[in-house]
Structures are given as C-alpha cells and as structure tokens.
Amino acid sequence: MFQQFQASCLVLFFLVGFAQQTLKPQNRKVDCNKGVTGTIYEYGALTLNGEEYIQFKQFAGKHVLFVNVAAYUGLAAQYPELNALQEELKNFGVIVLAFPCNQFGKQEPGTNSEILLGLKYVCPGSGFVPSFQLFEKGDVNGEKEQKVFTFLKNSCPPTSDLLGSSSQLFWEPMKVHDIRWNFEKFLVGPDGVPVMHWFHQAPVSTVKSDILEYLKQFNTH
C-alpha cells in the first residue's frame, strides 16, 4: 500500500502550497461561541495502539489543539510542522492531539497499525515520527462521529460556507457545522472550553502566531 501512495505525495504537497497562496486570510480562523455549555473534560479517546483510553480531563489547565489528520492528504506536510509547534509551545502548556479520519477523499485508508508506518515511510516520510498523541482512526462527522467532535463543532462556527464536493465527502447526514476537510484545528482553553477554530489550509505558522497572541492574556513566559 505504501508504494501506491509514495509517488503522489510530492504532487499533493505542491498543489496544496499553490492553493494556500490564494487563500483569503479572513477565512483562516474563527473565534468560538461565547457561553458554551460543557467542556472537553466530559470526553476521551483510545490511543492509536488501542492500549489506553485517555480522558481529556487530564489536560485541565492546558491549552489543547485538536486536529483531524490523514496521512495521504496533500496537507500531510503539516505533520512535521505540528511536531515543531508542539516542541516550541510545550513550555506554554500547549498540547497537540491528532485524530486520523478517512472521511475526506478516503485519504486515511490504513488500519490503526499501519498509520505510523505510513507517516514514517510515505507521507510525510523520511523517518517521520509524531511527537504528539495520535488516537484511533474514527469519524469526525456524521452519524458515528466522535462525541468530542460533536462538542467542538457545536461550540464554534464553521470556517467556510461551503462543504465541498460531495463525491469526496463520506458521511451522512451532512450538517452546516461539519468539518470541511483534513487538518482543521480547534484550540481549547485551560478551562476545557473551545476558543478558536482554523480552516484546514491555514498555515501552521499562522496557527502558532494566533496561539501565541492568545497566550499573552495568561502572562505565560
């Protein structure tokens, strides 16, 4: 399976880079709703190897970045950038959590046991190993979506008015607050309440700048 995707990765990265040049800045980030009821601490998820169920309440007091990911997406170039973000912001209490999903273009086709191998040898390849926590592959939209994503989506406006081509979207029913594509991001504050939501093509450098600006209110050094 890995050989099947390897040749296409560089092409995908090139196309995504071109698309980002035309992305309107005002669409890159939205602030989440005020007066949200509930927190992420009511939820949890199984790690990628299925050996541990992590309750998100263990991240109380931290700033948590939720990302839905896919190894064979053109945006997989964000993986090493997310590694760098995790390393650079960990002393600020920022934690990255990644959730593989196959609902957008069928770009995460592997089993849980194959995902890390795909990241290491194919996309992004070059021996890549994530420094942040990955969870089991699952849905972020539709009838079987993970409950934490139901909460995140209900807490924040969508980043775009358009859902995209239905031929590349694999869930039902479709709703206005659904995640649009791989690598959308939600920042949750130290009280467990969502703060910001980024469009999937927003550069990780922009996400980092937005987070650093947000952290100023906490006088974090």
UniProtKB/Swiss-Prot annotation:
Subcellular locations according to the entry: Secreted
EC number in record: 1.11.1.9
InterPro entries: Glutathione_peroxidase (IPR000889), GPX_AS (IPR029759), GPX_CS (IPR029760), Thioredoxin-like_sf (IPR036249)
GO terms, molecular function: glutathione peroxidase activity
Cited PROSITE patterns: GLUTATHIONE_PEROXID_1, GLUTATHIONE_PEROXID_2, GLUTATHIONE_PEROXID_3
UniProt keyword list: Oxidoreductase, Peroxidase, Secreted, Selenocysteine, Signal
SUPFAM superfamilies in alphabetical order: Thioredoxin-like (SSF52833)
Catalysed reactions, as listed in the record: 2 glutathione + H2O2 = glutathione disulfide + 2 H2O
Active site: U73
GO biological process, alphabetically ordered: response to oxidative stress
Domain of life: Eukaryota
Signal peptide location: 1-19
Location, primary (coarse class): secreted
GO cellular component terms given for this protein: extracellular region
CDD domains: GSH_Peroxidase (cd00340)
Tissue expression per record: Expressed in olfactory epithelium and embryos.
Similarity remark: Belongs to the glutathione peroxidase family.
This protein's name: Glutathione peroxidase 6
Source species: Homo sapiens
Lineage, uppermost ranks: Eukaryota, Metazoa, Chordata, Craniata, Vertebrata
